[in-house]
């Protein structure tokens, strides 16, 4: 217990109502957030002589101050607790590392509806199907749907400006509603309805309707139409035969847990209309000494009560762990959803099979993660030995990417003792430098990254500079000029130059911009972790550069051409079938567009070519 914090005096002021408490250390940082049905009773338990665990002892020893927020109900306390955990990320709480919203398939409410992937708030008019475990699962499903039910997936801006069908129509992946006369309203509406039924799990209805249409087409001697529908029926059957489907039409999430060596894996199966849409493994950050019960309860609360997760609530949640606050959680989720949500821990039949599958996946993923962590730990230990450091708890790496000096992007990737910390990866758009000046770009990104206050835990032990002596010299110069409240001498600056022909294993490392560098054996674990973080940084920089370049490319050059306003721009895109068609057009073809003179056509042609 802290000598400064007077627990007895504090407890005299605490009410017995429900609420949330925040514990602070001497630096004013929130180190733990908790909730209680009875605040006085719960907080008193922290200051007994016989504490429940070493984790609690370590926590109490650091308490300098406690804030209490009283709530009307336990449900309010539960919601507020998880909002505070997300806000403060306290080091003694179990933390869900990835709280990105889940992707859905969106069927728009347009006259000719389109299919698309959607994340975030559901403001757009239309229908949402999901959630899916990740973007890959959505893209894979969209590609499949496009082959079976050819409704459009293009953006409205493209759809509204076409005067002739695109390649998707030519290869049979779209019915071409953008061009009048290619498909009837009735046919397009029918295909949209098939998509709606298919995504709702009503495959039998889709097949029944398609079979009826095929038989009618045969009776009407429309054999080509009958053959096309037959192919569609076969495609639907191929897809549905591969899926494990519960007869009950379950709409639920199944959560399996594995816990070993202080690490937890929570595996979630997403099941809608009896179909497994996919699954995902989570590895929450678990403070030392945390019991499995706290891991599960905190994870489930954060998973459903933080941010946009509450938008994806199923009708039922299956768990392989008996929660002490199961009723409170179910009531809170039901209140949020506006309907009854059941939390079940002892399922039977198909549900028991689902739970066994989730538990097996959690155990398998945990074994893999522990193996990877062991490898990362060995590599970081080897690198610390090479660099003569006691340990490496955090390492950051920088890289620059551009095309002939244009759309320059710098990346910063972060590794900790467990490997990549992707939530902390950052990209920086570089501006105000001579195009192609990588040294100036590195100088700018380092000043932006480190020229400000940094939390003690976020100060890297090693900063890896990709680019060799010149880039390392820039880093040294920046750090020499930094005037910051944290210890700027703590990070070790390390330059890495690519080997001959950029061949992996031939890298040269530099502590100083002058003099000779040194190399590590190709099979060195220390070199492997350097290659890993450098490659991550390189890929992250290139990804950002490509996005920026695509954005510039898509922000049509037409907008910068004098004499081409919104109406002419729309006419050009509509007449030529999009920007690509316009880029490929000759001066004579551009001049045929209504409202475009010969002189303006030449200006547009040369602007797009150069």
UniProtKB/Swiss-Prot annotation:
InterPro entries: GIY-YIG_endonuc, GIY-YIG_endonuc_sf, GIY-YIG_UvrC_Cho, Hlx-hairpin-Hlx_DNA-bd_motif, RuvA_2-like, UVR_dom, UVR_dom_sf, UvrABC_protein_C
All residue ranges annotated as the UVR domain in the record: 204-239
GO cellular component: cytoplasm; excinuclease repair complex
Location within or outside the cell: Cytoplasm
Keyword entries, A-Z: Cytoplasm, DNA damage, DNA excision, DNA repair, Excision nuclease, SOS response
Positions of transmembrane segments: none
Pfam families recorded: GIY-YIG (PF01541), HHH_5 (PF14520), UVR (PF02151), UvrC_RNaseH (PF22920), UvrC_RNaseH_dom (PF08459)
BP GO annotations: nucleotide-excision repair; SOS response
Entry's family note: Belongs to the UvrC family.
HAMAP family for the chain: UvrC
Subunit (UniProt): Interacts with UvrB in an incision complex.
Function recorded in the entry: The UvrABC repair system catalyzes the recognition and processing of DNA lesions. UvrC both incises the 5' and 3' sides of the lesion. The N-terminal half is responsible for the 3' incision and the C-terminal half is responsible for the 5' incision.
Protein name as catalogued: UvrABC system protein C
